[in-house]
Amino acid sequence: MGIYFNGYQTPPGGKREVAITNPATGETLKKLPLADNGDGKRILDVAEDGFRQWSSFSLPDRADILMRFACLLEENIEEIALTECRDMGKVINECKGEVSHSANVAKGYVERAKHLQGRV
């Protein structure tokens, strides 16, 4: 398994790993590679390119992307909440509430974008 960024899994520069455990059960869920300084530099370079690309999108296009993100959160609430539940050791209803809240925050930014353009 590699470090996931820019839409791809990339082999890490180093060989160190971290175990992801469920704090409620102690179960090891997965071992993930740790990024090293070289990985961090590559990730920052990709992030700068992504920012330039995102900045070139129109406000309505950005709003559409955020709305799609919110819809994907809502469509996949069960899977996302279960993953968060196992990763954080929280109860499932709390995790569902957090995913739902995240979708609502994204929708809120879409509504704010409409006001920036004078549309309501």
Please place each PLM-identified region on the residue numbering:
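N-terminal Rossmann-like NAD(P)+-binding subdomain of aldehyde/semialdehyde dehydrogenases
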Residues: M1-V120
